[in-house]
Amino acid sequence: MIRGRMQGCIGVLCGVMAFAMVSVSAGEERVRESWPKVEFSAGTWISVGDTRWAHDASSVAGLGNPTSKLTYKDVGTNVIDLTGKFWFSPRVFGRLNGGFADIGGGRLTDDDYGTGQRLFSRTISNIAGNNMYYINADLGGRVKEFPNHRGYLDLFGGYQYWHTEHQAVGIGQVVCDPGAIPGFTCAAAGTSSNQGETVITNTANWHSIRVGASTEYRLTRRFSVLGTLAFIPISVLDNEDVHHLRGDLQQNPSFSMKGYGVGADVDVGARFMITKNLAANLGYRLYYNRAFSGDLTIHPAVGSSESFPLTQFESLRHGFTAGLSLIF
C-alpha cells in the first residue's frame, strides 16, 4: 500500500513539474532583467522538538489503549543550516538544503496504561543527546514575476530525509499504580534510578515527497518579505526504539515502527539586502510529520516478534532562523 501511494504521489509531483516547465518555456522570452546564477545561504535554526508515539496492545489481557505513550521534548537544538540554489535558466532552478545539530537537552515522559486507560506507570528521563539532521533536494520553476521587479512566485517539488535521535538518561518514577495491570510491578513513586545511564534510544527517520511554493515580495529596494510552504502528501516512517534496561527485549532494536502519513514545512521571514550580492535573513520555520497508519513490532530476546497497531507517531520541530545569503 505504501508503494502504491508513493507511486501515486510521484505521479502528482511529475505533473506539477511538467506544469512548471511549460510555464517556464512560455515565460523565457519575457525575461528582461538579469537573473542570479547561484545563491548560497548559511545560517542557524534555533529550534525545539517534539516526537511522540503510542501503540495499542489491548488485545493482550490487562493492557489499555494506548498501551504505552512516549513523548520526547528537546530544547536548545541549534541547527547549522546550509542551502545552495542553482539556476539552470532564468526560470528553472535546483535547490539543495541540509542541516545538522546536536540535541541540546530535554525530557522523555513514558506512560503505560492498563484496561480502561488507567495509568499504571509514568516515568521521566533527561534527554542528554543525541542528534538530528535533514536533507531537502528540490527542482522548481518560476511561474510568476510581480510588476516593477517587486518579487516572484516559484513552484517546486522534491524529496526530504529527516532524522532525529534522542538518548534518554536515568529514570524518575512519577506514578506507580500496581493495581492498574495485575501481575505487573513498578518502582514506588518518587524514586530515582540509573542516574547517568542511557536507558532508551529512539531513532526516527522520515522519507518524504514534498510539493510547494516559494515567494518573495519587495517592500523597498532593500527590504522584502518571503515565505515557503511545502505540503508532504506521502511520508514513510522508519523508527527504532531501544530499551537498554529491558533484558527481555532485543537491543537492536527492542521496538520497530513502520508507517506512512503526511506533513508540512513552513518558512516565513524577511530579507535585507546589505549589498547587491549579500543579504541578511531572519524568520521562523516549522517542520511537522504525522503517521496515519502503521505497526509497532516488539522484538523479544527469546521467541518470535509480535506486532500491534501504531496509533500515533508525530514529529514536530520549530523555531527562529537567521542567516546570510550570497547571490551571484
Report the location of each language-model feature.
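Short loop/turn motifs that connect adjacent beta-strands in outer-membrane beta-barrel proteins
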Residues: 27-38, 87-93, 144-153, 219-225, ...
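Transmembrane beta-barrel strands of outer-membrane/channel proteins
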Residues: 38-48, 96-102, 141, 155-163, ...
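Short gly/pro-enriched beta-turn/loop segments at secondary-structure junctions
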Residues: 204-210, 218-226, 261-263
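Cleavable N-terminal export/targeting peptides
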Residues: 1-37
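A structural/positional concept
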Residues: 130-139, 150-154
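Residues on the lipid-exposed face of transmembrane beta-strands in outer-membrane beta-barrel proteins
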Residues: 82-86, 135-143, 157-159, 211-217, ...
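Extracellular/periplasm-exposed beta-strand and loop segments of Gram-negative cell-envelope proteins
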Residues: 49-77, 100-135, 161-206, 233-267, ...
